[in-house]
């Protein structure tokens, strides 16, 4: 009789454990289905997107996007892309959106935007011993930019009267190369986001001089395809505004840059 009772108890316990295990698996499957993945296209652009010592994508844009999409019920995947093909990739659906210190200025009608969530200065940097001190001193000089970026357009189009005619505008595929060209003396100056230049100097223990006169102050946003009507862009915009108000954005930016408050002065950009 005792053996039968023991057997019955063991059997009930086994059934209970199997049931709980099944529920746990079901919960995990359910949790996965609740977390669709958003693919974010970016190139290497410290401090916005770069690989840490463990080879994991990190940076301002990575953290902001991860938190915004977490609040929306999504997981994020950072996809390293050829920056020159970003528009083609987002329009084809191979990525869901473009981030990576992406300027909204002059591109408002090209994409569906979430942002601006950061205000950034486009600036010119030179070697410390350079005789270039203001934008007009760039006349006849050689300047390097990353291809398809806002500085490239500024110097190609020269719609701003302050921008002189260069000797040569050299467009390079990767951001790191423009700093190498400047350090080696292949060019007289480079133009990029101020944060990128400052980060490069920290990472490589080098020193450039940034001109006080900026090329432009621009808003940084996340770009979706123009015909993307899923509503994800609009939801992300709401979450980014929420993060701005509750201090989350400030906390993230503070990890990477000094004087983080100035980068959140987006209300006067007019977008």
Predicted regions and their residues:
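Ligand-binding cleft/hinge of the Venus flytrap
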Residues: 65-74, 151-173, 201-205
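Periplasmic-binding protein-like
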Residues: 42-44, 119-126, 202-238, 259-271
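Bacterial lipoprotein signal-peptidase II cleavage site
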Residues: 20-30
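A ligand-binding cleft/hinge motif common to bilobed small-molecule-binding domains
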Residues: 85-88, 101-110, 154-157, 181-217
């Amino acid at each position: 009789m005792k053996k039968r009772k023991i057997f019955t108890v063991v059997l009930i316990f086994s059934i209970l454990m199997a049931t709980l295990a099944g529920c746990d698996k079901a919960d995990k499957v359910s949790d996965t289905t609740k977390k669709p993945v958003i693919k974010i296209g970016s190139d290497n652009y410290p401090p916005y997107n770069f690989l840490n010592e463990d080879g994991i994508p990190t940076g301002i844009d990575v953290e902001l996007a991860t938190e915004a999409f977490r609040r929306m019920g999504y997981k994020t995947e950072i996809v390293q892309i050829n920056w020159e093909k970003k528009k083609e990739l987002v329009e084809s659906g191979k990525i869901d959106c473009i981030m990576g210190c992406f300027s909204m200025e002059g591109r408002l009608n090209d994409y569906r935007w979430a942002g601006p969530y950061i205000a950034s200065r486009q600036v010119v940097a030179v070697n410390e011993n350079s005789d270039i001190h203001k934008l007009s001193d760039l006349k006849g000089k050689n300047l390097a930019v990353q291809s398809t970026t806002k500085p490239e357009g500024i110097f190609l189009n020269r719609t701003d009267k302050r921008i002189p005619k260069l000797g040569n505008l050299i467009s390079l595929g990767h951001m790191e190369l423009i700093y190498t060209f400047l350090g080696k003396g292949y060019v007289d100056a480079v133009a990029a986001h101020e944060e990128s230049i400052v980060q490069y100097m920290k990472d490589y223990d080098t020193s450039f001089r940034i001109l006080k006169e900026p090329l432009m102050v621009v808003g940084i946003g996340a770009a979706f395809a123009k015909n993307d009507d899923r509503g994800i862009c609009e939801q992300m915009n709401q979450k980014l505004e929420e993060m701005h108000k509750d201090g989350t954005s400030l906390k993230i930016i503070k990890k990477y840059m000094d004087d983080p408050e100035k980068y959140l002065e987006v209300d006067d950009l007019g977008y």
